């Protein structure tokens, strides 16, 4: 769920999910359209696509099982849908961590009206 995703993001980046990623670029936050603006925004685009492939549970509300082991996020659900949601969140949190060096504050609170030319998953 979004709370668990936020904890993953903080663990991998040291940043608050709400303050740093909830309204960033064209894809970080609710919904999304346009072309990803940078590597961080692309992490969100890929995450949105991943959620779009999940069947059988609500990705934003479903509580899954995971842990942090040796700096890694480990998803631990037997339920296929919950495991898929966890994997979407895990990959995105790692992606944010890998792209911290290109995070650009100018894309925080970016106007959605500037997001055009939507990419397909």
Curated annotation (Swiss-Prot):
UniProt GO molecular function: calcium ion binding; calcium-dependent phospholipase A2 activity; phospholipid binding
InterPro entries: PLipase_A2, PLipase_A2_Asp_AS, PLipase_A2_dom, PLipase_A2_dom_sf, PLipase_A2_His_AS
Binding site for Ca(2+): 27, 29, 31, 48
EC number: 3.1.1.4
Protein function: PLA2 catalyzes the calcium-dependent hydrolysis of the 2-acyl groups in 3-sn-phosphoglycerides.
Family affiliation: Belongs to the phospholipase A2 family. Group II subfamily. D49 sub-subfamily.
Protein name per the record: Acidic phospholipase A2 PLA-1
Organism: Eristicophis macmahoni
């Amino acid at each position: 769920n979004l709370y668990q995703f936020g904890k993953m993001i903080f663990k991998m980046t040291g940043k608050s999910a709400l303050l740093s990623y909830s309204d960033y670029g064209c894809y970080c936050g609710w919904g999304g359209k346009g072309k990803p603006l940078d590597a961080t925004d692309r992490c969100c685009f890929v995450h949105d696509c991943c959620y779009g492939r999940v069947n059988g549970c609500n990705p934003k509300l479903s509580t899954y099982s995971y842990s942090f082991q040796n700096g890694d996020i480990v998803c631990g659900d037997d339920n296929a849908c919950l495991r898929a949601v966890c994997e979407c969140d895990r990959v995105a949190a790692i992606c944010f961590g890998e792209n911290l060096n290109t995070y650009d504050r100018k894309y925080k609170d970016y106007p959605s009206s500037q997001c055009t030319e939507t990419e397909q998953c």
